[in-house]
Amino acid sequence: MSHISPIPEILADIKVGKMVIITDAEDRENEGDLLMAAQFVTPEAINFMIKHARGLVCLPMDGEMVEKLGLPMMTQKNGAQYGTNFTVSIEAAHGITTGISAADRALTIQTAVSPTAKPEDIVQPGHIFPLRAQKGGVLVRAGHTEAGVDLAQMNGLIPAAVICEIINDDGTMARMPELMKFAEEHKLKIGTITDLIEYRSRTESLLEDMGNAPVQTPWGEFQQHVYVDKLSGETHLALVKGTPSADTETLVRVHEPFSVMDFIQANPRHSWSLPKALERVQQAESGVVILLHRTEDGASLLDRTLPKGANQAYKWDSKSYGIGAQILAGLNVKKLRVLGQPSSFTGLTGFGLEVVGFEEAEK
């Protein structure tokens, strides 16, 4: 087997309890995970994962399942590079020995994903690592956690999966050439998160387009587009200059969180202040500035006003990528020239977007 399987074929294998390999983007973790629907897990499946894949066996679940089990997050301040939402590790409360064997780990997973599972059915810590998927799945965050829950959910299965990173014999991460060989050897299909995003995007949107109207700003007239986030209920704005074309580069600035401090702060934490971004787009007579709303409580607003926090670089919320990407795709933007410092943007290709360059703010 030497090709990427389309998502319908991946879904078909997941539905009958088979494992698949799911890969993410080269500019993200650039790894492949063994993945199967959690409700079909067996000791044999766990043994295959730990023997052949060698990574950490994790249990992606949707938020409702995590809350049902009363699982706290592993840390209140997530410093992981890609924001993976680990809860505390778990073990089945009954029927296991040390918890580490393939049979024990399978029983822990079976217990946790049972429709009748209760908090007292599991204990912490343990040898299985649950992951809380973002609501909205890969349309919000392009991770294996969300892909696992999506693939189960799209088949009408319990919204949980078992995943394990594939590692080479020498301890390095398996990349696509090794993953192709692994898939052929074990007769497994390979799917990509990018394809899953594209597949869902054809028929789904997490945003409701509320319409648009011209708006006057100190930097000229823009067309203001208003969107409501179906998951959070928050309102997002896009200020558009000109008519974006799929064939030409579009200046793009995605600004989040949108706050009064973006107007009055002399040294904002964003590389491009909002006024500078609007001025630059006005000069170019073409571009899009997106204002993503996120609730900012008193403590975080106070932190931004104090000297110690005023110049701290802003850390993007992983949910911002998916929401911003959907807005841009809906505006017919395809080729992005980003107003910002060079960085990687995960999962954009699944939305039909391409970053062709960056433009840093003048100091």
Curated annotation (Swiss-Prot):
- Reaction catalysed? D-ribulose 5-phosphate = (2S)-2-hydroxy-3-oxobutyl phosphate + formate + H(+)
Q: What's any GO biological process attached to this entry?
A: riboflavin biosynthetic process
Q: Region DHBP synthase: list its residue ranges.
A: 1-202
Record bears the keyword Magnesium: yes
Q: Keywords in UniProt for this one?
A: Lyase, Magnesium, Manganese, Metal-binding, Riboflavin biosynthesis
Query: What EC number(s) would the UniProt record show?
Result: 4.1.99.12
Tell me the cofactors it needs.
Mg(2+); Mn(2+)
Gene3D superfamilies given in the database record: DHBP synthase, GTP cyclohydrolase II
| Binding positions for D-ribulose 5-phosphate per the UniProt entry | 28-29, 33, 141-145, 165
Annotated site location: Essential for catalytic activity: 127, 165
Keyword hit for Metal-binding:
yes
Q: List the cysteine pairs that form cystine.
A: none
Q: Which InterPro entries match?
A: DHBP_synth_RibB-like_a/b_dom, DHBP_synthase_RibB, GTP_cyclohydro_II, RibA-like_sf
User: Which sites bind Mg(2+) 2?
Assistant: 29, 144
Give me the residues that bind Mg(2+) 1, please: 29
Q: Per the record, GO CC terms?
A: cytosol
Q: What does this protein do?
A: Catalyzes the conversion of D-ribulose 5-phosphate to formate and 3,4-dihydroxy-2-butanone 4-phosphate.
Query: PANTHER family recorded for this chain?
Result: 3,4-DIHYDROXY-2-BUTANONE 4-PHOSPHATE SYNTHASE, GTP CYCLOHYDROLASE II-RELATED
Annotated protein name in UniProt:
3,4-dihydroxy-2-butanone 4-phosphate synthase
